[in-house]
Amino acid sequence: MMQFQRDLEASLEAVSANAQELLKSLKSRKDVQDLNASLPKDPLDNCDAQTQAARAQLAEAATRILRLSIRPQEYLEHLQNGYQHLTCFRWLVELNILDHLPHSGTISYTDLARKASVPPMQLRSICRMAICNGFLEEPEANQVRHSRISALFARDESYLGWARWMVNYSVPAAYKLSDATRSWGETVAKDQTAFNLGMDVKVPFFDHLRQTPAMKDAFAAYMRNVTSNATWGLQHAVTGFDWASLPRGAKVVDVGGSLGHGSIAIAKEHTHLTFVIQDLPETVAGARKEMAQNDKIEASVKSRITFQEHDFFGPQTVKDADVYFLRMICHDWPDNEAKVILSQIRAALKPGAQIVIMDTILPQPGTTSVLQEQQLRIRDLTMMEVFNAKERELEDWSSLMQSAGLEISRVNQPLNSVMGLLTVRSAGQTALSGTNTLTPELVTAVSASTGSADSRPVLIAGAGIAGLCLAQALKKAGIDFRVFERDSHIDARPQGYRLKFEADAAQSLKNILPDDVYEAFELSNAVTAVGETDFNPFNGNIIHSRTGGGLSGKKGLYATFTVDRKAFRTQLMTGIEDKISFGKEIAYYKTDDSASTVTAEFKDGTHVTGSFLAGTDGLHSVVRKTCVPDHRIVDTGAACIYGKTVMTPEFLARFPEKGLRFMTVVSDIAPMLQSCLIGDSPVTLLLEPIRFSEASRARYPELPADYVYWALIGPKERFGSQEVTSMKNFVSLDQAAEQAAKLSLAVTEEWHPSLRALFELQDTKQASLIRVASTIPDIPSWESHSNVTVLGDSIHPMSPCGGVGANTAIVDADALAKVLVEHGTKPPVNAIAEFEAAMRTRAKRNIWRSEVGSKRMFGQKNLVDCSEFVF
């Protein structure tokens, strides 16, 4: 019951979040309506990647809600809908009904039946069944028109070709699977398949295809759609392997390459490569003719492609190739025949040559999205029904390679693709290593095959500073890991701009980062200037100013590094990009003490199992709420607006020059009577110029223009309690940023114009308003666990007034990494307890420092007296 409730809640949250993201995108689009367009268009066409990701996650969550809400007694009813919908779809396609449906406007059932020469009553019943499933529309009684779905088939002949192939060949074969099993049992014979029974033929699929021109044409139309479809598309072949690393003139053999679509796509992007496309004689003849007649293929591409007649079951005749490319080849054949194909290539491999296989890699059940897994299972069953073959899990691929004297050196599963890419070499040349772009799903598959918790990755919840630092430390130590971030991408929301690191964090970064990443980090930092200037907000005069002094002394703040947050996070992702999954929010986790594993369940319905879970998922940490359920987070009573103002000539002319040397503070203290009688507390502005050296810009031209980082902090009543509360209700982040920017102007409306320039010229899209939360300095201990812990803001959030939140998180990550390096990814519980105790001591010191700063800057009361933070 609890599992059901958790799954339902997670799916509902995913629907809400992604529906809002989708609506925000649709409302912001300024598509010009094409008045000459006739067929309805899909409003989701041409959306950006972020919107498409939200759409996919919405569809996934809706699918899960449907599964959860349907009662067992209704299952057969939904199957009935499925087969009747398919029946109606076939009727509409085979009787060419869409040819007679107008591209714009409606048509009566009577007129449509007359045009198509079909019985009117049948037409109406069949159309209305299709309408129930979104195919066609009936906007008024007895008037039918295209829907956005049916319009695709009227607009794109390749989809209609796929439809004809599905209803005439795929469906009959699928329906006869049980009969084939009853007749032949377990067999790999190509003429004893469900396809043979469904089509009533005696020969294997490809033999029948060659003998049947109509079927051959239908199959070609189907394959054209496959190559153009994004989930099956050739772009993944282009980007999924490092073709650029091959030497100039390198030879690629496209084994079983058919018409050469794969080679052509790669050749267009990589002009230094040559290609040999191999296939059977009749296929090669057709391919040569088609390429010669295709004016869309440039001569420079054609000149680097040759065709060769070849049967891949025979000896490989090209022995000087650098890469042998097999796309959708092995899945057509059972293991014994696939082994022959691979062995023939293995015998021809020159030293250093590779095999690139683009084919389906089946996930373990439940480790990828429902919709993705459905498509992969469809492919698996299709191979079984047509060829007595199968799609393979990673373990199956590994075993197949081993049988042919090969081994997998790299695995890449592109997002939104039904096929992965396997890079293969002769056995003994390499081993599957940490450089692979293995997705969490494939990691789960590997782990399941070995059964060893030690082989499972460390799971890191959150790609903030603590999470990425821990990831880099684990990479440096050779410990496998995966990072899961709830945001859809790294810049999904403003998170502040400037960070200052002191000596302890600087040392931890040196411990954590590989040498090349640390060197890049140092060079990408902003110029650090030590000092402070204080201004009167009302007349714009300097009150206090000191260069160095206390800030550079032993008792003051001594910043080792001044860091642009975005540049820093980018550096922290260097070399581990393939280990980070965005748009993955943990719903809950569960531990298995007997297996020493922990499984994270995500709100999109997927899950992944690891050896250890580190909660670095911030203030709203799901890991903390489970691991330390009674942990106290308090509301400091403050709100803070973070902002960024670029140092344009106009800004430099208006803002006080001496306010742009180092740290500047402006304190807006309440008037006397308000302070005495009402208890009005101050509002404080902290700002600092962020400038980059010429050397940094020469090395990293993508660094932002010089800017001023600022934070305006004060009691939330000064910002308007209602405004602070309502910010989280904005659908659009742009709306929230704009409102925060307006609020900064309202709070400082009586300030001197020279200082107000900071807010008037700010980048309004970069402003963000947050409520300031903290934990108390004396953090109570909790029961430790051997395979789960929390660190950073997940467990000890603190006010920004101390300037040490990020410092503390970095040192936490360094300390936890040392535990995992020393004890492995199944550390004893006492080792985790010692880490957590030291973390609490470290946090206490820094929370106290933040508390002191908060009292001065906005009149915060003692943290122990603050009320609970309401999320």
Curated annotation (Swiss-Prot):
Instruction: Please give the superkingdom of this protein's source.
Output: Eukaryota
Query: Which Enzyme Commission number(s) are on file for it?
Result: 2.1.1.-, 1.-.-.-
The answer on whether this UniProt entry bears the keyword Plastid reads no
User: Which pathway, per its entry?
Assistant: Mycotoxin biosynthesis
- Give the region (FAD-dependent monooxygenase) as residue ranges: 430-871
InterPro entries attached to this UniProt entry: COMT-like, FAD-bd, FAD/NAD-bd_sf, O_MeTrfase_dom, SAM-dependent_MTases_sf, WH-like_DNA-bd_sf, WH_DNA-bd_sf
Q: Which reaction does it catalyse?
A: nor-toralactone + S-adenosyl-L-methionine = toralactone + S-adenosyl-L-homocysteine + H(+); toralactone + NADH + O2 + H(+) = 1-(3,4,5-trihydroxy-7-methoxynaphthalen-2-yl)propan-2-one + CO2 + NAD(+)
Binding annotation for FAD: 485, 569, 793, 806
**Binding positions for S-adenosyl-L-methionine?**
279
What Pfam families does this protein's entry cite?
FAD_binding_3, Methyltransf_2, NAD_binding_8
Query: Which residues lie within the region annotated O-methyltransferase?
Result: 1-429
Recorded GO molecular functions are: FAD binding; monooxygenase activity; O-methyltransferase activity
What keywords tag this UniProt record?
Answer: FAD, Flavoprotein, Methyltransferase, Monooxygenase, Multifunctional enzyme, NAD, Oxidoreductase, S-adenosyl-L-methionine, Transferase
Please, one GO biological process term? methylation
Catalytic residues, chain numbering? 331
Q: What does this protein's UniProt record list under function?
A: Dual O-methyltransferase/FAD-dependent monooxygenase; part of the gene cluster that mediates the biosynthesis of cercosporin, a light-activated, non-host-selective toxin. The perylenequinone chromophore of cercosporin absorbs light energy to attain an electronically-activated triplet state and produces active oxygen species such as the hydroxyl radical, superoxide, hydrogen peroxide or singlet oxygen upon reaction with oxygen molecules. These reactive oxygen species cause damage to various cellular components including lipids, proteins and nucleic acids.
Q: Which family does it belong to?
A: In the C-terminal section; belongs to the paxM FAD-dependent monooxygenase family. In the N-terminal section; belongs to the class I-like SAM-binding methyltransferase superfamily. Cation-independent O-methyltransferase family. COMT subfamily.
Its name, as the record gives it, is: Dual O-methyltransferase/FAD-dependent monooxygenase CTB3
- Species whose genome carries this gene: Cercospora beticola
Q: Which gene encodes it?
A: CTB3
